[in-house]
Amino acid sequence: MRLDTNSNVDFKAFESSSSSCPVKLDNLATWGGSQKTDTRLPITDYSNLGGPRHNRSPFPLCKDVNNRFVIWDGDMTTLEVDAITNTSDETLTESNSISERIFAVAGNQLREELSTTVKECRTGDVRITRGYNLPAKYVLHTVAPAYREKFKTAAENTLHCCYRNVLCKAKELNLHTIALCNISAHQKSFPADVAAHIALRTIRRYLDKCTLQVVILCVGSSERGTYEVLAPLYFPRDQLEERSALWQLPKDIGGEFGEPQHPDPDRQIRIIRNPQHSVHMRHHLADDDSDVSPHDMEGNSSDLEYGARDMNGLSLNSYSSGLQAQLQRDLDRQHLLSDRPRTGVYENVISEGVEGIEHQERYERLLRRAQVEDLTEVSGIGCLYQSGVDRLGRPVIVFCGKWFPAQNIDLEKALLYLIKLLDPIVKGDYVISYFHTLTSTNNYPSLHWLREVYSVLPYKYKKNLKAFYIVHPTFWTKMMTWWFTTFMAPAIKAKVHSLPGVEHLYSAITKDQLEIPAYITEYDMATNGLHYFNPVPTAS
């Protein structure tokens, strides 16, 4: 299955004249249009063979999608599009064939912006810069994961995040044409076919949902064959290709956004058969000042297994160290002693360990979803945001209750946005200012949902929260706060402070660091007047 590229200018011709001869989208053959001049051999009809892997087409024929997708073997830096992509390392200084070409055409201004402004990009994330001398307006930078067979689940998930985050950023910026490079191309250990399936599947799901975007997948001559063979599985151009895909598509066809859906055994706790260690109690788990909690095992196997954080630092040592290694030994011990009586203390160690792992895995799944899903319907409300720092330099999170439409919003997406905003902040101390000003019953979520949110958030959220200010509380607010912190969240009860006015907040947060809507200050002046409180800096 060969894509006709006669209408595409040769790569070497562009290499010498990229700045003077930009390639317009109209000069490229779309995937749907390539069928007219395609010289493929007849496709094998699998209908007479055994049963297909799928009963119905997961990726049905769609001419509109095919006409917004291009596979192109050419120099990406010559494309006159809204954005192109660059794949690099976390310092954004890696030298590979893709980045070198982009830097050569864009000029030194791009390097300067990366070194002075952007500085770094985590694996799976995306950073944006201007295109400078490139025909493209912007460059979207991302970092592909390293591939290890032991951690293939994490690598595949993170590569999906790379593609998904780049595409979502393009949509967020209202970019209509984007050129994607083969993001995993410089990771030689990443299986080419696996990477191609992830890329094509993610692009197809994106184009299904975003009907105004055009995606150009730029591949090298050595990669083109793989993508042209696999593309009909996700972008069928006729009924025969669609029917053949039922047999040829892998069982894992991804989730709603193309994310890998791994079988259950990959997500289960690994039990070794010959454990050599005994059970040791970890007394610091009960210490509230510790950075480690049964519900907060950052940097251990959960990160490694699911790719939510740095994938370049994977090592067997980090995987088997710390709390996770201790819990693993406990579980191994349980496996061997399953038929023997156990003490209550030992059972508690096991149950807490399993519960902690499951809790962390759940949070990591939500975090991955928060990083890839479109949350503009929540972020656009403006009810939750970061506003400067307090007098001790801690980030201040502002929540405006009046602007939170609890009865008319997808509360699951609200939770995802909360996680997306707070996850990079809660690694250190932080404070929250909740403004109850002029709220109504339509702004009150159920206590069940609040309890669910509190239980989902890891230990670091509670430990590093140093103050929770409630401004303009009502009698109802005070009663519900007392009940919630007494029976559901006693760990934060001493950190909650009810303040009758905004000026009381200035004791902890200077006025220039607090950005709040005008309706709050207007209500405060109408209720309390002016200069009703002389703030004295505190170290709350």
Curated annotation (Swiss-Prot):
Domain Macro: 56-235
Disulfide bond residue pairs: none
Family indicated by similarity: Belongs to the GDAP2 family.
Organism of derivation: Drosophila melanogaster
CDD domains given in the database record: Macro_GDAP2-like (cd02905), SEC14 (cd00170)
One GO term of the biological process aspect: response to starvation
Superkingdom to which the source organism belongs: Eukaryota
InterPro entries named in the record: CRAL-TRIO_dom (IPR001251), CRAL-TRIO_dom_sf (IPR036865), Macro_dom (IPR002589), Macro_dom-like (IPR043472), Macro_GDAP2 (IPR035793)
Annotated ranges, domain CRAL-TRIO: 371-528
Effect of a null allele: Shortened lifespan, impaired locomotor behavior, and increased sensitivity to deleterious effects of stressors such as reactive oxygen species and nutrient deprivation. Locomotor anomalies include righting defects, reduced and uncoordinated walking behavior, and compromised flight.
SMART domains on file: A1pp, SEC14
Protein name: Protein GDAP2 homolog
Pfam families noted in UniProt: CRAL_TRIO_2 (PF13716), Macro (PF01661)
